[in-house]
């Protein structure tokens, strides 16, 4: 008993804890291993280099892991990752445990040991590594290292070669240095050591190694050498005697020169000075030389140091622009980008603290020019007043940023004290703190961004040095401005920002420790009016831009400052209303600088620039040649931009250029010529009643004095464009117009980016563009046309060129090409086109390859139009006759072929009627009516194609698949396909696109009246018309061949016909089927190239007469149709009695022979000479057939028996029992 009790007791304790053990085991399996002490495996890695491993490495990784490592680098870098160790559970397709690598372009999965020792690069500046494990089998995992690799030159400096035979750092061969009469040159440099020796930082020389431009240091001091003139710069450099301008940290130096001033501008350490150098007046630096960094002479060494961000412009910048020059202003001659340089790898060194490097998220691109002067064209940099302590400022990126800083944002001043334990250089401390601030506020719940970060100096310090504590511990005081955009009205207290920074203290770089943090919100400047008429609202410290009250398009500005020692104290700075007082010439010159070569203008920039120029033009009553030249150069620079960027502002730009030409001052001269690189303008005075100007031409100059040469007299030998005005140009002008006619304006466009047709039918512009206008009036419908001769942009054969003018009102005022009133003259050739136009505007030559109807000459167009209208009229009449015949006589429409023929005739009838009415309806200029006609024409064209295809399908069923074929509701299904399919296609087109883009007026000739309501979109045309017909056409060809094989096979068995009779019968069958199945529409496929015109004639003749041929072969020549006509329409001896032999023959279903089948095979093809027989006998009944009048002929018929099976019967000399036929 005791034993039992013990056993029972023992068993009791054995099973009692089992539920707990089960839960514990489940917990072990399900809880991620990081709970037991392994590191977190969902992190973002943004350090320049480092390592990461699988959880618990080098021990086995836990079960059920889902890890993600996001590796990020700044713009301009990629990430390279290397797997030093790799051991993950192996399985097919890595279905259990796996590591997935996403490089930005593709995703790759690894398992087993496949990735060990391999390296992978990201496609951009971010890479994702994910790792997952299942519930069983653990392995060692992986160990990976990563590093940033610089791919942008902005992140790399150049180590200058110290010997001429070491290597050369030069501008790439693809970059051509232009001839320079002025330049601005900026670069940053460092110098190693304190040797007082001569050196050269850069040199520019010709092919014979003659120095053309160089900068360096000689015994006499720092110099800039231009050609053979050496200009000393010591007086402009704020350095002591024998002190190097460059030290161990980078300093930027900018040099400015203009050959008309005789002085050198030097901008160094935010100080701009000029030094005289009269020997450089009128000198020009030749182009196509070789630019090197360092020295190209053996006797002079290169600067012993590094160079960075070397940029060169072929124009001058003033002190204000240079003081605000940002990293994103690209040099238009040479820029610090890989494409501009040929640099050996050993000369490059990547660093993360370069001034224009992208070690953080980059700021928006700054604009070149004074923002206060240019209004909305760019955003000014906020400058601190002179009363504030000096700062060293670093631009900071935006964290969770929006596109522009908002004035309603809340601004905080963050003051941090950093302990510099390892005594890092101040530049490095600044960089590390910047990274730390960026990472701290990245992906925060509040939308904030840091404006800048700076070292703060207390009063009395003359250098940027550290503050030292009592323990002589080096500390740095840094200030940063943080902007909070309270988009959701959520309050952000300063202590929350402070706690966020303190919490992230550990992420600071080694050797740096956060000592204290202080966050204070900045105050507001009060609203006020100063001076009168200028109202400044209450804002936080920032710049506020106010439109000039009496000068639309220009603006005044004022800055709200905060007190450095007490951020709650704010005050307004002085009002800058200089822009409101500027003359148009000064503003135009500033805009010209903004558009100078090399500037990367966006579409928004161009739109703003055009708007500014438009305001200048509208304001000025008379524009002198100086201002006009500046404005034309602005437009010329704009034309160098991409076509996509020009599209939005093209219409306004063209209107402004026209207005500019009209306002050019001619009081002191009879004509004005302005030439630029991409644009030329010529304006000449003109008196009514005279022929002072009979022609104008523009061509390339005989020398290099200007871009183009313009001539109003004899013309040039081979001009790019010329205009010949008719002698009666100014006749019959009204008195009002005569007053306005005082000038003629001609504008030539070398670049055609402003002429982009966004309409659905986009033709290709193959010539330059020439604009002509007389005063400010509209002249059209000239008795004698204006002759415009325009060169093609490329010498090539342009088949059927189209002369067109630019219609500013087309395409919802975006503009588009219009051919009305212009035709191409026969004197045109491969290199140029001669256009004759009856009005004035912007003229160009287009090429429209696929649809060439509008490219025919006037004679062929008239002939083809005449043939089409006459043919369609005849076709409509006889299609109506065919349809009326079958509708009127009930006996004719009992069989299926007759019903199919009726539907085909209906589609043809409406197609021809709509075609005849289309041109007349177009003349009403009612868009809705034109679209409706085009839609109906499209529908009935597709319906015609469809019913021709159904004819072919029916013949195949009747002649080839003759046994055991039964289709319920045969005609109903054909009607659904015949009318429903075209309706579906047209409905889809109408639903998927704007009706105005698909259907509308289309020009199909060169005369003004050659317009047609039809499909405008070429894609819709080729898919729904050409493609649709192509399918039906090839189907009909296949059916045509099959049917003809059947006919010829049966007719070939007859022995009582001569060869001539056999050929004629087969030929008649071919002709009747050709028109019935629409085979003549296939001529369209051959209307290309030299055979274009002949096949267009064949196409027009046969297809416009299709209704006539169908009437002849499938109505008039049918015996049962003739019988009905004679019975009901004829009188006297021509009338046929109802009980005639002919009638009996047909009524008793005595069929003609297969040659008669061929004779009238058709839509009424099968059994066409009699009605179809629907047998009333049972399937077991016997049917006998009567002998035909031709005893040797075999008659052929199809009929449907009661059960619905299609039957085939033969009639011969002997009565044959065929069964249930």
UniProtKB/Swiss-Prot annotation:
> Per the record, what is the consequence of mutating residue 815 to A?
Abolishes G-protein-mediated cAMP release
Residues bearing carbohydrate: 121, 143, 206, 258, 314, 324, 353, 438, 445, 452, 485, 488, 505, 563, 593, 600, 605, 667, 673, 695, 704, 750, 776, 811, 818
Give the span(s) annotated as Stachel. 842-850
**Membrane-topology descriptor:** Multi-pass membrane protein
The UniProt keyword set, sorted, is:
Calcium, Cell membrane, Cleavage on pair of basic residues, Disease variant, Disulfide bond, G-protein coupled receptor, Glycoprotein, Membrane, Metal-binding, Phosphoprotein, Receptor, Signal, Transducer, Transmembrane, Transmembrane helix
Give the GO cellular component terms, alphabetically: cell surface; cytoplasm; endoplasmic reticulum membrane; membrane; plasma membrane
Ranges in the topological domain labelled Extracellular: 38-862, 925-929, 992-1024, 1091-1092
In the record, the effect of residue 468 to A is given as: Abolished cleavage by furin like-convertase without affecting localization to the cell surface
Positions contributing to Ca(2+) binding: 89, 97, 134, 136-137
Highest rank taxon of the organism: Eukaryota
| GO BP, sorted A to Z | adenylate cyclase-activating G protein-coupled receptor signaling pathway; adenylate cyclase-inhibiting G protein-coupled receptor signaling pathway; adenylate cyclase-modulating G protein-coupled receptor signaling pathway; cartilage development; cell surface receptor signaling pathway; establishment of blood-brain barrier; G protein-coupled receptor signaling pathway; heart trabecula formation
Q: How does it assemble?
A: Heterodimer of 2 chains generated by proteolytic processing; the large extracellular N-terminal fragment and the membrane-bound C-terminal fragment predominantly remain associated and non-covalently linked. Interacts with Laminin-2; this interaction stabilizes the receptor in an inactive state. Laminin-2 polymerization could facilitate ADGRG6-NTF removal, thereby exposing the tethered agonist to drive myelination. Interacts with PRNP. Interacts with ITGB1. Interacts with LRP1.
Protein name per UniProt: Adhesion G-protein coupled receptor G6
- What is the scientific name of the source organism? Homo sapiens (Human)
Q: What lineage does the source organism belong to?
A: Eukaryota, Metazoa, Chordata, Craniata, Vertebrata
| Gene coding for it | ADGRG6
């Amino acid at each position: 008993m005791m034993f039992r009790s013990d056993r029972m007791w023992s068993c009791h304790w054995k099973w009692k804890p089992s539920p707990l053990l089960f839960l514990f085991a489940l917990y072990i399996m399900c809880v991620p291993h990081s709970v037991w002490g392994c590191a977190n495996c969902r992190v973002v890695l943004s350090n320049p280099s480092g390592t990461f491993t699988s959880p618990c490495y080098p021990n086995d990784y836990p079960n059920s892991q889902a890890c993600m490592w996001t590796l990020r680098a700044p713009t301009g870098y990629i990430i390279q990752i290397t797997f030093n160790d790799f051991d993950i559970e192996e399985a097919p397709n890595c279905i259990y445990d796996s590591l997935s690598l996403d490089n930005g372009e593709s995703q790759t999965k690894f398992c087993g040991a496949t990735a060990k020792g391999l390296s992978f690069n990201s496609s951009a500046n971010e890479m994702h590594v994910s790792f997952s494990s299942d519930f069983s089998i653990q392995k060692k995992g992986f160990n990976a290292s990563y590093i940033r690799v610089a791919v942008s030159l902005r992140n790399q400096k150049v180590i200058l070669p110290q010997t001429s035979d070491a290597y050369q750092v030069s501008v790439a061969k693809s970059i051509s240095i232009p001839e320079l009469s002025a330049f601005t040159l900026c670069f940053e440099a460092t110098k190693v050591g304190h040797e007082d020796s001569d050196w050269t930082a850069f040199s520019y020389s010709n092919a014979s190694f003659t120095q053309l431009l160089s900068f360096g240091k000689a015994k006499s001091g720092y110099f800039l050498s231009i050609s053979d003139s050496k200009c000393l710069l010591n007086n402009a450099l704020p350095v002591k005697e024998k002190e190097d301008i460059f030290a161990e940290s980078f300093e930027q130096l900018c040099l400015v020169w203009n050959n008309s001033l005789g002085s050198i501008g030097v901008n160094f350490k935010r100080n701009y000075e000029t030094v005289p150098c009269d020997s450089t007046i009128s000198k020009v630096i030749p182009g196509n030389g070789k630019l090197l960094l360092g020295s190209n002479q053996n006797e002079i060494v290169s600067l012993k140091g590094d160079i960075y961000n070397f940029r060169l412009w072929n124009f001058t910048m003033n002190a204000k622009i240079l003081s605000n020059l940002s990293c994103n202003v690209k040099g238009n001659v040479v820029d610090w980008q890989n494409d501009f340089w040929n640099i050996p790898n050993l000369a490059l060194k990547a660093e993360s603290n370069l001034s224009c490097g992208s070690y953080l998220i980059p700021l928006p691109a700054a604009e070149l020019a004074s923002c206060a002067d240019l209004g909305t064209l760019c955003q000014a940099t906020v400058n601190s007043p002179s009363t504030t302590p000096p700062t060293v400022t670093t631009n900071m990126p935006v964290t969770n940023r929006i596109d522009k800083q908002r004035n309603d944002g809340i601004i905080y001043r963050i003051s941090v004290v950093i302990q510099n334990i390892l005594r890092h250089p101040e530049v490095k401390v600044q960089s590390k703190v910047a990274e730390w601030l960026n990472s701290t506020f990245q992906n925060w719940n509040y939308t904030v961004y840091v404006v800048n970060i700076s070292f703060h100096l207390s009063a009395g310090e003359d250098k940027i040095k550290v503050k030292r504590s009592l323990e002589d511990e080096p500390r740095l005081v840094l200030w940063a401005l943080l902007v909070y955009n309270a988009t959701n009205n959520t309050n952000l207290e300063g202590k929350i920002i402070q706690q966020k920074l303190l919490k992230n203290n550990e992420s600071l770089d080694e050797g740096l420790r956060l000592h204290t943090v202080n966050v204070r919100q900045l105050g507001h400047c009060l609203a006020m009016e100063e001076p009168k008429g200028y109202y400044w609202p209450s804002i936080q410290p920032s710049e506020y831009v106010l439109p000039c009250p009496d000068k639309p398009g220009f603006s005044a500005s004022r800055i709200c400052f905060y007190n450095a020692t007490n951020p709650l104290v704010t005050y307004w700075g002085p009002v800058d209303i200089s822009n409101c007082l500027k003359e148009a010439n000064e503003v135009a010159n500033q805009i010209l600088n903004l558009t100078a070569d090399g500037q990367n203008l966006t579409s928004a920039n161009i739109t703003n620039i055009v708007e500014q120029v438009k305001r200048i033009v509208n304001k000025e009553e008379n524009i002198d040649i100086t201002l006009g030249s500046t404005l034309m150069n602005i437009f010329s620079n704009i034309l160098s931009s991409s076509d996509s960027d020009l599209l939005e502002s093209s219409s306004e730009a063209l209107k402004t250029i026209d207005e500019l030409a009209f306002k050019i001052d001619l009081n002191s001269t009879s004509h004005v010529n302005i030439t630029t690189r991409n644009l030329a303008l010529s304006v000449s005075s003109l008196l009514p009643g005279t022929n002072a100007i009979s022609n104008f031409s523009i061509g390339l100059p005989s020398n290099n004095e200007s871009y183009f040469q313009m001539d109003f007299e004899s013309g040039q030998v081979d001009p790019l464009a010329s205009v010949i005005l008719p002698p009666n140009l100014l006749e019959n002008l009204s008195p009002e117009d005569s007053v306005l006619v005082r000038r003629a304006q001609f504008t030539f466009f070398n670049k055609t980016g402003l002429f982009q047709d966004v309409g659905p039918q986009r033709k290709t512009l193959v010539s330059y563009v020439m604009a002509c206008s007389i005063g400010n009036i509209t002249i059209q419908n000239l008795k004698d046309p204006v002759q415009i001769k325009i060169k093609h942009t490329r010498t090539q054969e342009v088949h059927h060129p189209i002369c067109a003018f630019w219609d500013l009102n087309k395409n919802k005022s975006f503009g588009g090409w219009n051919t009305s009133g212009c035709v191409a003259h026969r004197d045109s050739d491969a290199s140029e086109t001669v256009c004759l136009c009856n009005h004035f505007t912007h003229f160009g030559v287009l090429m429209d390859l696929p649809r060439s109807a509008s490219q025919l000459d006037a004679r062929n167009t008239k002939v083809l139009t005449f043939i089409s209208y006459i043919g369609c009229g005849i076709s409509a009449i006889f299609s109506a006759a065919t349809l009326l015949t079958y509708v009127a006589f009930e006996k004719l429409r009992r069989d299926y072929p007759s019903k199919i023929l009726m539907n085909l005739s209906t589609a043809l009838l409406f197609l021809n009627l709509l075609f005849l009415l289309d041109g007349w309806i177009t003349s009403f200029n009612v868009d809705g009516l034109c679209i409706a006609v085009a839609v109906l024409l499209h529908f009935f064209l597709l319906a015609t194609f469809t019913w021709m295809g159904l004819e072919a399908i029916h013949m195949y069923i009747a002649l080839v698949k003759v046994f055991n074929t039964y289709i319920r509701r045969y005609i109903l299904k054909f009607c659904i396909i015949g009318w429903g399919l075209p309706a579906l296609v047209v409905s889809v087109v109408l639903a998927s696109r704007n009706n105005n883009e698909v259907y509308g007026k289309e020009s199909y000739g060169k005369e003004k009246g050659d317009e047609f309501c039809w499909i405008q979109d070429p894609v819709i045309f080729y898919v729904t018309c050409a493609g649709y017909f192509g399918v039906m056409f090839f189907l009909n060809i296949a059916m045509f061949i099959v049917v003809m094989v059947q006919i010829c096979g049966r007719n070939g068995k007859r022995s009582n016909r001569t060869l001539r009779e056999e050929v004629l019968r087969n030929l008649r069958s071919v002709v009747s089927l050709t028109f019935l199945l629409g085979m003549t529409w296939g001529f369209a496929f051959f209307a290309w190239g030299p055979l274009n015109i002949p096949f267009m004639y064949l196409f027009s003749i046969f297809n416009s007469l299709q209704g006539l041929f169908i009437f002849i072969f499938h109505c008039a020549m049918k015996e049962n149709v003739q019988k009905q006509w004679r019975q009901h329409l004829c009188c006297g001896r021509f009338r046929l009695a109802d009980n005639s032999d002919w009638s009996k023959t047909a009524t008793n279903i005595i069929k003609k022979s297969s040659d008669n089948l061929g004779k009238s095979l058709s839509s009424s093809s099968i059994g066409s000479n009699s009605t179809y027989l629907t047998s009333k006998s049972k399937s077991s009944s016997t049917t006998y057939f009567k002998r035909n009048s031709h005893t040797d002929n075999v008659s052929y018929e199809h009929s449907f028996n009661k059960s619905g099976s299609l039957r085939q019967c033969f009639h011969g000399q002997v009565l044959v029992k065929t069964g249930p036929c």
